[in-house]
């Protein structure tokens, strides 16, 4: 099933923002959330959960979404992930994304099953698969975070972030064992194997 506008159309009197995140699982980098308020008169082809789209298709959809819809980004840093835990940091990123919108939504549809104190927020399990607004947000969040990791890769190339985007691939884990963790690694995330915990600062070659 492709995402559709059924929920948005059933709540036609509301200003609805779809929200999704990227980066809950990686060993490095922030968690990034996006909020999107769609213009229902402009439907973009190929809007789906970002995970099922190719990189080129995500980039194409990203350009169309950001040129035609209200959107914003919210970020929770590695330090916040380690301080609060990944769930609370993800919620923080989602809240920030909504606050950063140029338009104030009256209802916020969030992918997943998180609980929020703001009663505008409604969590929808697998929302990125059924809700057009959430799927749009998933694309914006994914492309934004991937681009951030590309930039960080230039400073720390041995970890392969241009390919793994901070996820725990074999290359990434071996690099951590060899070179240690950077300031962009989540020290609260554990995995098997011995690690050199000394932080690596500055450029790496």
From Swiss-Prot:
Cell compartments where the protein resides: Cytoplasm
Annotated GO MF terms: manganese ion binding; RNA binding; RNA-DNA hybrid ribonuclease activity
One GO cellular component term: cytoplasm
SUPFAM superfamilies associated with the record: Ribonuclease H-like
Enzyme Commission number, as recorded: 3.1.26.4
Major site of localization recorded for this protein: cytoplasm
Keywords carried by this UniProt record: Cytoplasm, Endonuclease, Hydrolase, Manganese, Metal-binding, Nuclease
Swiss-Prot/TrEMBL catalytic activity: Endonucleolytic cleavage to 5'-phosphomonoester
Protein name: Ribonuclease HII
UniProt lineage: Bacteria, Pseudomonadati, Pseudomonadota, Alphaproteobacteria, Rickettsiales
């Amino acid at each position: 099933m492709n995402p559709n506008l059924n929920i948005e159309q059933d709540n036609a009197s509301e200003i609805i923002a779809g929200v999704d995140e990227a980066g809950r699982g990686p060993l490095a980098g922030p968690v990034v959330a996006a909020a999107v308020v769609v213009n229902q008169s402009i439907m973009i082809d190929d809007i789906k959960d970002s995970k099922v789209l190719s990189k080129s298709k995500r980039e194409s959809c990203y350009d169309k979404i950001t040129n035609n819809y209200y959107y914003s980004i919210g970020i929770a840093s590695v330090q916040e992930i380690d301080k609060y835990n990944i769930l609370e940091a993800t919620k923080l990123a989602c809240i920030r994304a909504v606050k950063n919108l140029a338009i104030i939504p009256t209802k916020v549809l969030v992918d997943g099953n998180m609980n929020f104190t703001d009663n505008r927020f409604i969590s929808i399990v697998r929302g990125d698969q059924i809700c057009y607004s959430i799927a749009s947000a998933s694309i914006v969040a994914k492309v934004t975070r991937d681009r951030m990791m590309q930039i960080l890769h230039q400073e720390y190339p041995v970890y392969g972030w241009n390919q793994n985007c901070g996820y725990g691939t074999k290359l990434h884990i071996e690099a951590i064992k060899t070179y240690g963790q950077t300031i962009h690694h989540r020290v609260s995330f554990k995995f098997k194997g011995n690690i050199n915990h000394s932080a690596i600062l500055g450029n790496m070659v």
